[in-house]
């Protein structure tokens, strides 16, 4: 493959919204932010190149109380118990708390088709159209994980 224009077109078109699950201060290393989404939702293209991150203003945090001078480097991790689940090793971010939302930008290429329902069901997909946001793929449920599985009759309980 010499040229892959699709990735250049699609990457900026999709963003991943993640919730901060935990914030830890690691002595000698700095802040570690753990999100509810990570490598299980991001495509391999996103795994090789760090994506820009930013906090989403949900209105419950006074953004004026967090000037850029309060930002500090943070390592950002996904929810997987794997050393590869690093979203960013050092991104300047404001003070964060569990429940805050982070936006992983430029996450479009192959993200939906190659995400894996590991640890939790897959995320929904929202299209931001001319009339506002529209759900175009609902979030998976626990039942969705098993809906295609078939149980042979000899394994069924009487």
Question: Where are these predicted regions, by residue range?
Answer:
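Charged (often Lys/Glu-rich) extended helix/loop segments that serve as interaction or gating elements
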Residues: 1-158
């Amino acid at each position: 493959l010499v040229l892959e224009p699709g990735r250049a077109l699609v990457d900026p078109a999709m963003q991943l919204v993640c919730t901060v699950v935990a914030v830890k201060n690691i002595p000698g290393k700095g802040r570690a932010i753990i999100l509810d989404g990570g490598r299980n939702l991001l495509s391999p293209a996103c795994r090789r190149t760090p994506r820009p991150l930013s906090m989403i203003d949900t209105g419950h945090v006074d953004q004026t109380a967090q000037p850029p001078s309060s930002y500090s480097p943070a390592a950002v991790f996904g929810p997987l118990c794997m050393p590869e689940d690093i979203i960013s090793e050092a991104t300047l971010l404001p003070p964060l708390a569990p429940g805050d939302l982070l936006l992983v930008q430029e996450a479009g290429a192959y993200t939906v088709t190659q995400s894996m329902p590991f640890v939790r069901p897959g995320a929904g997909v929202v299209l931001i159209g001319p009339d506002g946001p529209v759900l175009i793929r609902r979030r998976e449920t626990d039942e969705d994980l098993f809906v295609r599985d078939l149980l042979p009759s000899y394994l069924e309980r009487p």
